[in-house]
Amino acid sequence: MAPRPPSFKTVVVEVDRDAGVGTLRLNRPRKSNAIDPDMWLEIPRALAWLDEDEDVRAVLLCAAGKNFCAGIDVSSPELLSEQLGQATRSGAPSCAGREAEAMYRHVRRLQESFTAVERCRVPVVCAIQGACFGGGVDLAAACDVRVCSKDAVFCVKEIDLAIVADIGTLQRLPKLIGHGRALEMALTARAVDADEAFRVGLATSVLESPSELQRNAFALAKTLAAKSPLAAQGTKAACLHARDHSVNEGLEYVANLNASRLRSADLAEATRARFERRAPAFAKL
């Protein structure tokens, strides 16, 4: 019997085993899916569970309600303080050095929550509707493919809270849309609509409505899930490596990768299926 997805407070996990698609849905719609302390913990846990499920060959990351993600939850001064790692630790010795070390470790933990998207072996498709602000941009930028509805609005909002965006936007967004555009978005906190997001490469397609977005994004994830899981995993890994390394280093990496991939059963199956004019049937990863 297939394992049942775990239950979480702030996200929902579902698996369509026939399609090979796992869905991770942000589920705080009344708060516009603002990121609270529970969500920071649950997103990587949900992704880790999906990554270990052999039936899941692609992940759809989406959100309940009208908005994808409003960024960190700033609904109260106390919650904002906790989110920023400023809560006091009773009984712990304190000095500027220790406080800086604690803040460093706090930020690194938050970064790891969204880097988990990149570390997920399978492709992750992100479906964005409504507001995608602050931490929402951090999360979307970590995904492999982004599609949005016409009402989507992107905003790197941190500077308006006197914060340097530190969860991944300043590292990933320039690689997606270029250094100049990313820096302008981060310095101005200017809202970018869906059409502009498509023009600059932040989104690969724009759908008319949120319902059409969900159908299209799931269909895209299903298409990716039908590919060779070894080839899909390798393609994702090679592209991520190439992003952060030189061309020569990237070529060396993919040569080593394909030294094993070109001897896989998936290559033989894809070749047979092509000559037999049928869809290939790949084994689980």
PLM regions and their residue ranges:
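Terminal low-complexity tails and localization/encapsulation signals of metabolic enzymes
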Residues: A2-V11, R272-L285
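C-terminal long alpha-helix characteristic of the crotonase
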Residues: V147-A152, A194, A203-Y253, A259-A265, ...
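Conserved CoA-thioester-binding segment of acyl-CoA-metabolizing enzymes
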Residues: M1-A64, L79-L80
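CoA-thioester-processing core
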Residues: E112-R121, A127, F133-L187, V200, ...
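Acidic, divalent-metal-coordinating active-site segment for phosphoryl/phosphodiester hydrolysis
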Residues: A189-E196
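Glycine- (often His-adjacent) and acidic-residue-rich active-site loop
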Residues: D55, A63-S113, A162
